[in-house]
Design a protein with these regions (language model features):
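Lipid interaction determinants
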Residues: 19-149
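Single conserved hydrophobic/aromatic residue that forms the stacking wall/gate
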Residues: 1-11, 15
């Protein structure tokens, strides 16, 4: 019957409207990321085939010191700061960052660059992933969850 089609069509419209409400923030990632982010959970591991006794893994809310990345402030001018968990700024206080697709590149200097993948971002939550594989088969993996500070 034609009524069935109308119902399906209506549900489709409602469904779309619904998801539009949830997607209220259509700004580019480079704008959404601006601000201060406070670490709330960190997990990851370090594996080194050459020194397996040094392998480690973690999965916990932040303690006194962060495992791999701390709190961040990203600024519109393309600079960022990383902070200790007690709020003090790290020595390398202001560095540059860029973003392409969903990858943030932290540029500490011409030799030190870190690529962080944005797994999730909402108005008050950010999940970043760092995954680095060495030539020797070793790997450093870290996943950090933040709340807006």
């Amino acid at each position: 019957s034609s009524r069935g089609l109308v119902d399906v069509y209506k549900e489709g419209v409602n469904f779309t409207a619904c998801s539009d409400d949830e997607e209220e923030d259509n700004r580019p990632l480079s704008e959404k990321i601006i601000g201060h982010w406070v670490l709330t959970y960190e997990e990851g591991y370090i594996k080194d085939p050459d020194y397996p006794e040094d392998d480690e893994a973690w999965s916990h809310a932040p303690k006194d010191e962060y495992e791999y990345f701390g709190n961040f402030t990203f600024r519109e001018d393309g600079t960022y700061s990383e902070y200790e968990l007690d709020g003090t700024s790290n020595p390398q206080s202001i560095e540059k960052w860029t973003i392409k697709d969903n990858i943030i590149t932290l540029i500490e200097d011409e030799h030190e660059q870190y690529e962080l993948k944005v797994l999730e971002i909402t108005s008050d939550k950010l999940v970043l992933e760092f995954d680095y594989k060495n030539e020797n088969g070793g790997e450093t993996y870290a996943k950090m969850t933040y709340k807006r500070g």
